[in-house]
Amino acid sequence: MRKEEIPDKSRTIPIDPNLPKWVCQNCHHSLTIVGVDSYAGKFFNDPPPSATQGSSIHGANSVLGSTRMDNSFVVLPRHKPPQSQGIPPRPRGASSPQPDATQSGKAMEESFVVVYKSEPVSDSGGSHNLSLEVGQNGPLHSNTSGFNATINVLTRAFDIARTQTQVEQPLCLECMRVLSDKLEKEVEDVTRDVEAYEACVQRLEGETQDVLSEADFLKEKKKIEEEERKLVAAIEETEKQNAEVNHQLKELEFKGNRFNELEDRYWQEFNNFQFQLIAHQEERDAILAKIEVSQAHLELLNKTNVLIDAFPIRNDGEFGTINNFRLGRLPAIKVEWDEINAAWGQACLLLHTMCNYFRPKFQCQVKIQPMGSYPRIVDSNNETYELFGPVNLFWSTRYDKAMTLYLMCLKDFADFANSKDQENNIPPDNCLNLPYKIEKDKVLGYSITQSFNKQESWTKALKYTLCNLKWALYWFVGNTNFQPLSATVSLPSNISAAGSLYAKRGPDSSKPSCKKT
């Protein structure tokens, strides 16, 4: 059989692939056992003749001895150690082999295996037979018993090493070096400790020990006995004082218990009083809180108007809203026509309510017909225009006419309110002036018509229209005592019929904000 080889810087050592794969127990790297490493090293460096290195056959006179053994040979270990020292035995009945012409001219290559076989001891001196199985470039036959013996020897060697070193075997060379260095260091430490102990023992042995004489010993004994009597007397005195202190301690504990009882009774009565006081305070605070809430509610009711609660006008981004209905459309936000119609219905109902309150003093050429989400506007010629959609965005003249008429009605009501303020001698700065100027069909320059108009401009015009309507609503609330017909509760008598709320709000409060609240 062919043998594997491990490359080395100076030589190669044959490896038997049939051997099991050993693993280093420290670094867990795989190991390959190559015969006996020490034997292989000595073999390549001119090994001396000995029993452990007996694989060289017949010295220089043999074929194996006359030829340099390099990568061409694998020497398997013997099953049993040789029984005698000296030259390895030869086969019985065979003389010293001499190199012939055919063998000496051939280089011995990677096809030779030296296998030791066990033979019974002969009468002449117990020599063993050595069988050489040689095959030029052919298959080699392994010795099964020799292989098993090799495994047993290695296993036994590892067990012995493990028992003696208390370290798991086998180990690779690097781990063996590390372990060796560690053990050497421990040995050095132990050696230093031993030397220190020996020095200490020698020092103690060299010291002189003073031995007291009989007289000195008796004198020292009397002195110690005297000290002992004094200590006993002190202990008795201390025990007496301890008894007195314990008696006083019991009296103090009795007094302390009585004091604790009195203190517990006092705190119990104090806690009961505090509990009653807290209960009365909580009842008082609850009544005061109810009074405060009732007063705030009354004040809120005094300032509340049904129109402000019924028609809240706010801003929602780019849209003006009334009762949370958006009025207008944007390219990015497609508001449904149902929501726009509902917003117009609320706006028409609010303006119609305020206009009817001042009739017949307030006469407007435009009449509003609030009909839910389908309001209509009637002009001076009794022509009716629908103020609801959907309508054609590019041709909606009737819808545009209805919005223009609504804007005209709102402007007429604002002019009427301004004239009422002037009649009541209100300063011009506090008179009703719409924040966004209305001119025909435009609010602050933005047209309220939808035909041929951008949705952004139309939405802004509607937003400003609702803001003007909110200003008119606040003026109406501040200058009237308006209540629905079904109302049974009237405002307090201390509020006058005209101008009271409007005057109390001051100049800033008369200008409502259109911001979202």
Swiss-Prot record:
One of its GO terms (biological process) is autophagosome assembly. Its main location: cytoplasm. Keywords: Coiled coil, Cytoplasm, Cytoskeleton, Ubl conjugation. GO terms for cellular component: cytoskeleton; phagophore assembly site; phosphatidylinositol 3-kinase complex. Component of a phosphatidylinositol 3-kinase (PI3K) complex composed of ATG6, SH3P2 and FREE1. Interacts with SINAT1, SINAT2, SINAT5, SINAT6, TRAF1A and TRAF1B. Interacts with TUBB8/TUB8. Component of a complex made of VPS38/USL1 and PI3K main subunits such as VPS15, ATG6/VPS30 and VPS34. Binds directly to VPS38/USL1. Plants silencing ATG6 exhibit impaired autophagic activity and accelerated senescence. This is Beclin-1-like protein. The gene is ATG6.
